[in-house]
């Protein structure tokens, strides 16, 4: 517990600091009148012991400039990434819209992924949200929700996306015909994530890793349902 004398001293110190700051704020000419004294003032420094007030101020200014430059660089990198994302998505959309059938659209989707250096791209649809039964020719796209649920809980949790490896049993659920899959980018399709699953696969086990950006995946997951409805009706 602090003694009354200590509390009084802290109060006086606080008042003195405030008084000094207020005085300097209202009397900026102080620095002109006392230029030599200001130049001789020393400020504690963690490495050099002390530095002059002028050096201290210049160091703060340099740090501020460095922060501004870093922020500007980050903004420019983000703008470049957004531009790249926009054109990549536009390229995909223009390809898929030009398809004359669902089969052709799926081939175009797969080729787009291959052009990016991936093993391929796959769509799987939940049959309780799409009419995939006979006489539909697209029953092979159906993904049993109950069979998928353990994988979803294990890999996605509360997220809409998963990036990383899948084990053998998991691959049999979502990519039963795929071979040499090292890692995947998996996204739940639709605004509520309940329409199906989009999978991009790579033979490289380190290509997709947790923590990578998912903005492109999100945009594709929102774009595809409307295109699919040209050939498959929703339940």
From Swiss-Prot:
InterPro entries: DUF484, GAF-like_dom_sf. Pfam families: DUF484 (PF04340). Gene3D superfamilies: 3.30.450.40. PANTHER family: DUF484 DOMAIN-CONTAINING PROTEIN (PTHR38765:SF1). This is Uncharacterized protein YigA. It comes from Salmonella typhimurium (strain LT2 / SGSC1412 / ATCC 700720). The gene is yigA.
């Amino acid at each position: 517990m602090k003694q009354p004398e200590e509390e009084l001293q802290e109060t006086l110190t606080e008042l003195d600091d405030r008084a000094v700051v207020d005085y300097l704020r209202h009397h900026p000419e102080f620095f002109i009148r006392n230029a030599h004294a200001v130049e001789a003032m020393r400020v504690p420094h963690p490495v050099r012991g002390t530095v002059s007030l002028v050096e201290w101020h210049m160091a703060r200014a340099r740090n501020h400039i460095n922060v501004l430059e870093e922020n500007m660089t980050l903004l420019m990198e983000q703008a470049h990434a957004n531009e790249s994302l926009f054109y990549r998505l536009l390229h995909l959309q223009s390809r898929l819209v030009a398809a004359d059938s669902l089969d052709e659209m799926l081939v175009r989707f797969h080729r787009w992924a291959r052009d990016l250096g991936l093993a391929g791209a796959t769509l799987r649809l939940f049959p309780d949200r799409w009419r995939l039964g006979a006489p539909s020719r697209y029953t092979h796209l159906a993904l049993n929700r109950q069979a998928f649920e353990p994988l979803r809980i294990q890999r996605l949790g509360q997220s809409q996306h998963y990036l990383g490896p899948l084990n053998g049993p998991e691959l049999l659920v979502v990519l039963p015909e795929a071979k040499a899959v090292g890692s995947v980018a998996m996204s739940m399709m639709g605004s509520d994530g309940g329409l199906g699953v989009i999978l991009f696969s790579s033979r490289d086990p380190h290509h997709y890793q947790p923590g990578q950006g998912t903005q492109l995946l999100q945009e594709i997951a929102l774009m595809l349902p409307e295109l699919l409805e040209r050939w498959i009706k929703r339940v």
